[in-house]
UniProtKB/Swiss-Prot annotation:
It comes from the Bacteria. Homodimer. Disulfide bonds join C59-C93. The gene is tpx. Keywords: Antioxidant, Disulfide bond, Oxidoreductase, Peroxidase, Redox-active center. Thiol-specific peroxidase that catalyzes the reduction of hydrogen peroxide and organic hydroperoxides to water and alcohols, respectively. Plays a role in cell protection against oxidative stress by detoxifying peroxides. Pfam families: Redoxin. HAMAP family: Tpx (MF_00269). One of its GO terms (molecular function) is thioredoxin peroxidase activity. It catalyses: a hydroperoxide + [thioredoxin]-dithiol = an alcohol + [thioredoxin]-disulfide + H2O. This is Thiol peroxidase. It comes from Campylobacter jejuni subsp. jejuni serotype O:2 (strain ATCC 700819 / NCTC 11168). Its EC number is 1.11.1.24. The active site is a conserved redox-active cysteine residue, the peroxidatic cysteine (C(P)), which makes the nucleophilic attack on the peroxide substrate. The peroxide oxidizes the C(P)-SH to cysteine sulfenic acid (C(P)-SOH), which then reacts with another cysteine residue, the resolving cysteine (C(R)), to form a disulfide bridge. The disulfide is subsequently reduced by an appropriate electron donor to complete the catalytic cycle. In this atypical 2-Cys peroxiredoxin, C(R) is present in the same subunit to form an intramolecular disulfide.
Length: 175
């Protein structure tokens, strides 16, 4: 069990913490159109952004920032996961012009939260997801950042470095 902070106060997380190098747990989540989005499948690269709710300022900013940066991640599929209802996620994407990434809801079974160890288990945000970033390559966890303070953004510079930097042409290493 991991612990993060919410406004400086420790909060316990429920579920199994996944580590870099481990097989990525496969889970099915609901997209904004109620179709299924599979997390953890082999054959692709996924950047998973776990957030408490798109209806909070920090989460909304994170989604907007990553929406702008998707092209710099060498064809990786970027998915924002929260407990928001798919309909609310769709409205958020429409209102904010989010078109370059996917949103997925874990509201049905909280399977993502438990299998990735980011389900908040106590306090005011109990039942929501902690802020984290996972990169899944070929079905394996290749990168993980569990953000210590839920109200803060993940370290985007570290993720950029993982993908080879953020050059003008998408981190391809040609500069």
């Amino acid at each position: 069990m991991s612990i993060v902070n919410f406004k400086g106060n420790p909060v316990k997380l429920k579920g199994n913490s996944v580590e870099v190098g481990a097989d990525a747990p496969k889970v099915n989540l609901k997209a904004k159109d109620l179709s299924v989005i599979e997390i953890g499948a082999a054959g692709k690269t996924q950047i998973i952004l776990s957030v408490p709710s798109l209806d909070t300022p920090v989460c909304a900013t994170e989604a907007r920032e990553f929406n702008k940066k998707v092209a710099s991640y060498n064809g990786a599929e970027v998915i924002v996961v929260s407990m928001d209802l798919p309909f609310a996620m769709g409205r958020f994407c429409s209102t904010e012009g989010i078109e370059n990434l996917s949103v997925a809801s874990d509201f049905v079974a909280k399977e993502f939260g438990e299998k990735y160890g980011v389900l908040i288990n106590e306090g005011a945000l109990e039942g929501l997801l902690a802020r984290a970033v996972f990169v899944i390559k070929e079905g394996k966890v290749a990168y993980k950042e569990l953000v210590n303070e839920i109200t803060e953004m993940p370290d985007i510079a570290k993720l950029d470095a993982f993908f080879g930097g953020s050059s003008c042409c998408g981190g391809c290493g040609c500069h």
